[in-house]
Each structure stands twice: as structure tokens, then as C-alpha cells.
Amino acid sequence: MADLQTMRAIYLMAHGGPEALVYRNDIPIPAPRRSEVLIKVGAAGINNTDINTRVGWYSKGEGDAADASWGGQALSFPRIQGADICGEVVDVGEQADPGLIGKRVLVEPCLREANGEPLVSPWYIGSECDGGFADYVTVAARHAYPIDSSLSDAELASFPCSYSTAENMLTRAQVTENDTLLITGASGGVGSAAIQLAKARGASVIAVASGAKQQSVLDAGANRALIRGNSLHDELGDNAVDVVIDLVGGEDWPELLNILRPFGRYAVSGAIAGPIVELDLRTLYLKDQRFAGCTVLDEGVFSRLVGLIERGDIKPLLARSFPLESLSEAQAFFLDKQFTGKLVIDMGL
């Protein structure tokens, strides 16, 4: 590390389209603060969070930069994005465990500590602070989880954001082996993760995806696949499932509550078909349904995820890898949605 002073990275210069992403090879390598580690990034996954942040989707106004970060604050530019990170610890701050040096780690994306200080409100790496679309990144040591796995860095980088989001949703919905789940957006990163994680809990899974992706969600472990856009009522009838894991929202959203049984649990962590939905409160209260918004990870979610990976209980669904300088191309491919699983930036390409 002593001879290296600069690194490659992709700077996000402003909210906007792919033109706001700028490749640089002269960015100073960050130094770890007292309780931080410095990670040499092996791979970093592509996900909705980074694109939503880039375009200002989180703003409740018209893309107003004052509230367009994941945490609802103004984003600081330039920003290095990248929430899915696998790499090797190469340096530590004075209060971090030097035994971490040389360890391969996954980074928990939802941060409760940054810049050596505890956070009042959690941050998301790559939004409120720099992330993994770079050769090096710093993070609080508590958020760098050593992992013992034969999987490649690219395969491991497919896990952190999508799988922790999915596991958090299943945790909030208290999913057990006695439950039947409906998962919307089931072919995407979080959806395909939710299939595997729900099956690991012994639950039965109904996956909703496009017609072209029916077999892929069945291959991921779903017990049944439904074509997106078809009537859920016609396919399943009312009161058919115990849990809905929703990543889609949109105009068909009321159907989800109709197929959800009395005392059923609804968990949401995405709205790719639109964030504004129509709710008939009578359905909610007369059926005693429970809602869970899922953003901040519950304590223990990420450590459980690492354990599942190490035991081989879940498998990576790596669709394609791209080099760092092709991030714009990778995000365009991501938005085209003609794949199942995860896309990854592989720093070795």
C-alpha cells in the first residue's frame, strides 16, 4: 500500500443519466479512520439503489436534490456509488483489529457507523458515503464481515444488497415453513434472492415474473410461477397466501391485498412499477393485515446471510460481469431487465 496513492473509480458528478458517470484513474486512495478498514475491491454488484440515487428517484418532489439520497438528504458530489461489495482488507485504522488484514470480506450496505462515529440515522454505502465502484473503499470494521467461501469475488458481490434486503423482508414478515408466499418482481436481484431465502426457511413460494422468465424463477426454487400482468385473482382466488413480498407496487397493487389471507403479512422494499398505489383501508383493517416497510436492516440479518452463504444454503445467481469502465453499459443492461439474477462489476476485468 505504501507505493499506491491513486486508484480507479467512477464518479457520479450530478443527478442525471449515464452521462453523469465519469471514469477516473487519478482518485486518491482513502485512508481508514480510527475504527475503519480499507478494502481492495474485488467486485461490486449493480442494483436499483445506485440507479435510483443517480436519477434522484428517492426525492418526493420532482427530483429535488435536497432529498434525493437514500436517507432523504441532499447527495454530496462527486460521489462514488456501489452498494454491493466483496474484497480484501488491506489496511486498518488504529482502533480496528489488525487481524482483519488479508481477510476476504462482504460489506453490510446499511451502515450504522461512518467516519469513525455512530450514526443517528443509518446510511447506505454509495449514497451517503463512497461505495465500491472503485479499486478501494473504506468502511467501519463492524460492517466488514469476513467470509469463508470458495465462491469468486464476483459471485459473492451478488449477495450483499439484494440478499440482505430479501432476508430483511422475510424477517419482518416472520416467514416460517408453514407459510405460502407470493413474490412480485421475482426474477430481479431481490426477488430471486427472496425465492432462495424463503425456500431455505421451508416456505412455499409463488413467483410473479414475465412470461420469458417463468422457467428461471422455477429454477431458482419457486414452487409455482405466474405471468406478470395476469389477474392474480383468476390465478389464485382470494385469501390464497400468507405473505406478500412486494418489489413492484404499481396500479395492480390492490390485488395483492385481496389474495392475502386474514392476518396476512405484507412486506415492501421496492416500487419499480410506481410508488403511488390505491389502498382501500377496509381491506387492511377488516382482514387484520400487517404491513412492513423494509429499508434499514434489522440487527442480525447480515450475519445470518453470511452464515447461509458459507454453508452453501443459497447460491449466487450471477447473470453477467462487466469491467469498471463499462458501468454505464452495465446499468443500461440492468434497466433492460432481460436477465435473471445479478450483474456485477468485476475489478479484475
Predicted features along the sequence, with ranges:
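C-terminal hydrophobic helical "lid"/dimerization subdomain
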Residues: 2-5, 13, 168, 299-349
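Glycine-rich beta-strand-centered segment in the early N-terminal region that forms part
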Residues: 28-45, 59-111, 148-150
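NAD(P)H dinucleotide-binding glycine-rich loop of Rossmann-like/cofactor-binding domains
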Residues: 71-75, 108-185
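Conserved "cap/hinge" positions at secondary-structure junctions
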Residues: 93, 109-110, 185, 209, ...
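Glycine-rich phosphate-binding loop and adjacent beta-alpha segment
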Residues: 121-122, 251-317, 346-349
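Hydrophobic/small residue at the entry helix of a nucleotide-binding pocket
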Residues: 165, 189-190, 213, 251
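Adenosine-nucleotide cofactor-binding segment
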Residues: 180-183, 199-252
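N-terminal Rossmann NAD(P)H-binding glycine-rich loop of SDR-like oxidoreductase domains
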Residues: 187, 195
